[in-house]
């Protein structure tokens, strides 16, 4: 039987290639009309917008076995990345294994396999697969917070933002502190009548270049030699010396240390603030009509709120019993292997301090080696103990903001490589849990 791969974005394509390399037959399903996932502007679950660029540098983002062109800029735009993913699929012969315009609606355990129900242009079918890889990402179900009051103004989640024309000539309030919020508020500052940014808590604003090189390459160089606490102190000192504290720009100072949340990268935000084109506000207290009252008592009349407030982690095609307390709390060995459902694996169900592509490539190799019988998991009790230890360490570093999903980019890549080597030795020695035994 084949393996079913759900999603043909970066995670699904990396998985499909790894399975192909290991000689494991697979079929990939995606609701879009081309591969590339969220990087395809206008795709069914895409949150891409016209001004979107990478927020991690080219050399830290590319797949290890398929480098991006050396003459590309440090931070390519969405068009280049979507094309890169399409070329990746063509180069490695993956396109024929992808069923586009096909949506997975249900995945159910069936004996030692899995029944996968898929809706496509010709109707709905159910087929049995040996294993399932969930690789469809987790940025498709918008989260919009609720506030007291009765708003009459227009509201838009960043998931549905496409072009600065949506903001032109309007009084715009952007809510959130992530990368999308910074991109959109800068876009608004060039075309809107007035532009405000609301932040409930402080974030570390990192320029895309420091000391003449992409900023994430500096931390990457340190990661090979220093623990994260030491890197944190060095990075915070460097930012304070080169950029200054956020409060210098009227922004709230973060209460968390650097490297204890995903960094927010922006070259334009601080400049637009200091030029008076973006006003900074604290969190929202309530919204009445078109008036937004802030937690400091200030009131602003607004035409449009753009909610850059993240996403709910939602996997509606899976039995809730398989997700325990929720997809964002699900313990997974190495953030890949389900502890209680052999053959159910996840690629990309994580939040990294760096780029996603190298992480999902490493996870895909673990999945493929396991399903090919060349990688053995440790014993079940060892897996559970490791998950508990990883969660405790994550809570110590990241608190309660989805600690189960958090990973350190450089540390995880090193750990995944070590895990693959150790699991290969376990399989060769007849130890551990192989795919045939687990199934």
Q: Language-model features: where?
A:
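Short, mixed-charge aromatic SLiMs
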Residues: 385-398
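Flavin (primarily FAD) cofactor-binding/catalytic cores of flavoenzymes
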Residues: 1-54, 67-204, 208-209, 220-228, ...
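Active-site segment of extracytoplasmic enzymes that catalyze sulfate/phosphate-ester chemistry
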Residues: 60-61
